[in-house]
């Protein structure tokens, strides 16, 4: 009798995705982040669901409802901090996952890569709206600054901003719709993640060497299930260390002050995982130019497959490209640091140089380096 997991219509899908899936034998720990992202997403949906049971999306009670969750609800504090720090872990895994894709040339699976970019935008939108919900000072002013950027759109900008606000300023209508969208978008992300996997399983996984491994595959279970469990344990350990020892390490103290439209915080800044994009936005003095640079800083990923000029897939055997990749990582860390600094000398010029370098590496230096490396290999 054939095993039920291979015949049952539903079990068959799970079997072909997580059990009998042919997998390259040499994929490293950098391939763990996909499963970790899945765990993060499920964790965020579950903790978010329990938070939504006690949260009230109303400008007068939102802040106190979050306080109530932390003080009065059974284990409310741990749920709240797991949700807040879970978002940070989510973005750490996301950036690692994308870095792996860039380094090893996984972007040559264009459908998988493009779905990934849409997923990134979805999760960034979700995280931004989630930051608004506690209705602290940084929630309110962060939302004001970011939504105001849409007024840079020619002709329809102001109408667009008022349409999103649901009025002439950020108020009850804005908070309510942000809560509704913050609740629904993770489920959209879940569906997109399924499509992401669907396209990935059409081609099979890439591997560190970049050489096709069709002739040499091993089953996903037990080899990679056990490896993923190790990754998951390390993820949960890191998250719980953060939650239990320094839950406010990555947050902003200003968000413990209830939102006040009459008092602007001295430094308005988003959560740490958006600081690199915020630095790029601020590095351009023109409003529309800044907004375009902000969007392009992420959308640039979509043209990476078109700029792939190397005869090799990954960077494993390309030392010059490796140097450029790590320069890009250092540049992004610099941008993250600059995004959290006040707009004054020398931070302005450092931010502008780092922004120029970011686009130069991706658009100019990497394709040229690949061509040079191709020619070196011909000798």
From Swiss-Prot:
Pfam family, one: Cytochrom_B_C
GO molecular function: metal ion binding; ubiquinol-cytochrome-c reductase activity
Cofactor requirement: heme b
GO cellular component, one term: respiratory chain complex III
Single Gene Ontology BP annotation: mitochondrial electron transport, ubiquinol to cytochrome c
Protein topology in the membrane: Multi-pass membrane protein
Key words of the record: Electron transport, Heme, Iron, Membrane, Metal-binding, Mitochondrion, Mitochondrion inner membrane, Respiratory chain, Transmembrane, Transmembrane helix, Transport, Ubiquinone
Subcellular location: Mitochondrion inner membrane
Major subcellular site: mitochondrion
Subunit structure: The cytochrome bc1 complex contains 11 subunits: 3 respiratory subunits (MT-CYB, CYC1 and UQCRFS1), 2 core proteins (UQCRC1 and UQCRC2) and 6 low-molecular weight proteins (UQCRH/QCR6, UQCRB/QCR7, UQCRQ/QCR8, UQCR10/QCR9, UQCR11/QCR10 and a cleavage product of UQCRFS1). This cytochrome bc1 complex then forms a dimer.
Descriptive protein name: Cytochrome b
Gene, per the UniProt record: MT-CYB
């Amino acid at each position: 009798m054939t095993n039920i997991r291979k015949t049952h219509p539903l079990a068959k899908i799970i079997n072909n995705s997580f059990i009998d899936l042919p997998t390259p034998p040499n994929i490293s720990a950098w391939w763990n982040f996909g499963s970790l992202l899945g765990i993060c997403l499920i964790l965020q949906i579950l903790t978010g669901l329990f938070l939504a049971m006690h949260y009230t999306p109303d400008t007068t009670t939102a802040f106190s409802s979050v306080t109530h969750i932390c003080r009065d609800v059974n284990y409310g504090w741990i749920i709240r901090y797991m949700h807040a720090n879970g978002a940070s872990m989510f973005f750490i895994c996301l950036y690692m996952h994308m870095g792996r894709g860039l380094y090893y040339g996984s972007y040559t699976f264009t459908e998988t890569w493009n779905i990934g970019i849409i997923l990134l935008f979805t999760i960034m939108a979700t995280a931004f709206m989630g930051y608004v919900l506690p209705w602290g000072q940084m929630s309110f002013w962060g939302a004001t600054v970011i939504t105001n950027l849409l007024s840079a759109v020619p002709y329809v900008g102001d109408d667009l901003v008022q349409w999103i606000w649901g009025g002439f300023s950020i108020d009850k209508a804005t908070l309510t719709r942000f809560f509704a969208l913050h609740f629904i978008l993770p489920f959209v992300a879940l569906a997109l993640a399924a499509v992401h996997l669907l396209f990935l399983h059409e081609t099979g996984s890439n591997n560190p060497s970049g050489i096709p491994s069709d002739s040499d595959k091993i089953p996903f279970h037990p080899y990679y299930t056990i490896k993923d469990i190790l990754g998951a344990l390390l993820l949960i350990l890191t998250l719980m260390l953060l939650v239990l020892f320094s839950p406010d390490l990555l947050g902003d103290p200003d968000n413990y002050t209830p939102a006040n439209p009459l008092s602007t915080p001295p430094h308005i800044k988003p959560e740490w995982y958006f600081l690199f994009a915020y630095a790029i936005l601020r590095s351009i003095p023109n409003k529309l130019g800044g907004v375009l640079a902000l969007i392009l800083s992420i959308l640039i990923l979509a043209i990476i497959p078109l700029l792939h000029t190397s005869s090799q897939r990954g960077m494993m055997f390309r030392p010059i490209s490796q140097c450029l990749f790590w320069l890009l990582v250092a540049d992004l860390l610099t941008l993250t640091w600059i995004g959290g600094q006040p707009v004054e000398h020398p931070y302005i010029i450092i931010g502008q140089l780092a922004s120029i370098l970011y686009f130069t590496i991706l658009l100019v230096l990497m394709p040229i380096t690949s061509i040079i490396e191709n020619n070196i290999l011909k000798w």
